[in-house]
Each structure stands twice: as C-alpha cells, then as structure tokens.
Amino acid sequence: MSCPRAVHSAATIGNHLLFAGGYNSTTGKYLSTVESYDASLTRSTAVELSSAKNGLASATVGEYAMFAGGYKGNSDAAYVATVDAYNTALTKTTMPDLSVGRYGLASAVIGDYALFAGGISKISSTADKYQDVVDVYSA
C-alpha cells in the first residue's frame, strides 16, 4: 500500500480489488485514497473518495463496488452519509446518500441488493447514537 492505514474498507469489482479510506496513524490524517490491485497484483490509484474518512463499509452489487458512510473527524459533520461507487473501469459515481450519516456500519449483499446496517451517529455534542437503520441499494 502507498501508506500505513487502518479502519479502511475493501471491495472487489471486475478484475480489481479496491482498498478505500482509513486512518494513517503516522500522519494523524483520515484518508480519501482508493488503491486498486488488478489480477496480476499491479497497484494503481483510483479516483479518490468524496471525502477523507475511516470506519466506512463496502459492498459490491451489480456493476458497482460501493463504499458507504464513515467518520472524518471531531465535528458535528463528522459522520458521513455519502456512498461512493466504482464500476469495472474504476470510474466513480456518487449514489444517493445513506438515510443517516454514520460509521462502524456493517454491509452485506443478498441477491441484487447491498444492505448497509447499523453504525454510530452523533445526536449531540457529547452523545453518540447506535443506529438500527438499514439502507438498501439495488444493482
């Protein structure tokens, strides 16, 4: 990888494996980079996420690898609702937002649907909320 990272997410699309976002403890920065490895393990960089974040979830359904939610720092706007999607050509598309910005959410695919469930969001300057919401995206 191009830098140390943790709390990132991974997905496959076509002949590509993507690692997205995360946190670099060496620099103390959240990451927006998306690194791609092809079937011959050649590394390249895809178009960046819409914002630097960690704690995001990923799922691949149909033509898209999706990276949803995340956390981007200590502020009221730190809980991200954005869903960035990459096709087999590694072209980025932004999908409709999650219903609630959150991080630490889980993801799974069933049939033609990607589900993003749970996670943590902010309800006040001193309190987090554990979510029971499930957002569904179709192929």
What kind of feature is each model-predicted range?
Residues M1-A139:
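Kelch-like beta-propeller repeat domains
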